[in-house]
Amino acid sequence: MSPSQDPSLENYRAIADGIATLFFPHAEVVLHDLRSQRVDYIANNLSKREVGDDSALEDMLEGDSDERNIGPYEKLNWDGQKIRSVSTVLRDSAGQPLAVLCINLNISLFESAKAALDLFLSPSKLIPQPDALFRDDWQERINTFLHGWLRQRQLGLNLLTREHKRELVLALHAEGAFKGKSAANYVANVLNMGRATVYKHLKELKEGGD
């Protein structure tokens, strides 16, 4: 803290440092002193402003302004990168505006990553499943049925009980899933159970139907 800085704002400077550290290097936090209308503190300076610069936040001192959080809103940084910001009005014990804490997050990197993901995951790049490849794809049919069964019951594959697995084996059998040559072994691996247990359930089903 410099000699000209108000010690009453020191806690807010520490908060600014904490936020900037958490989101480093993508976030700048600026503390404006509304009484002096000057920039009091900057953590992780991205905007090239300086402590002591004019804040131009006189409107924040108007008596009828009761806003606490303003934003998020967007602005453009000096280097052309997009910034998303939120400003919080800090008040004293009497409820009077004392300072404004502005968090400025550089979202250009995240937007570039999103654009790359959107391009990579775009459904327009997909073609329908080729019949020649999927006509006899018993693994695909098992996977589709399995996860539909789990969704209906709001279950996770890693949380299945023995009884759940037994019910699922029987349901897969009813769906004709075990017509594939290696289907029993595949189901055993997916459900994390012994192949002998799968055959046991199938045998019980067959004996029960006799």
UniProtKB/Swiss-Prot annotation:
Expression induction or repression: Induced by growth on D-arginine and D-lysine.
Keywords tagged on the record: DNA-binding, Repressor, Transcription, Transcription regulation
One GO location term (cellular component): cytosol
Any one GO MF annotation of this record: DNA binding
Coiled coil: none
Signal peptide start and end residues: none
Pfam families: HTH_22, PAS_6
PANTHER family per record: TRANSCRIPTIONAL REGULATOR DAUR
Family the entry assigns: Belongs to the DauR family.
Purpose of the protein: DauR represses the dauBAR operon.
Name of the protein in question: Transcriptional regulator DauR
Encoding gene, per UniProt annotation: dauR
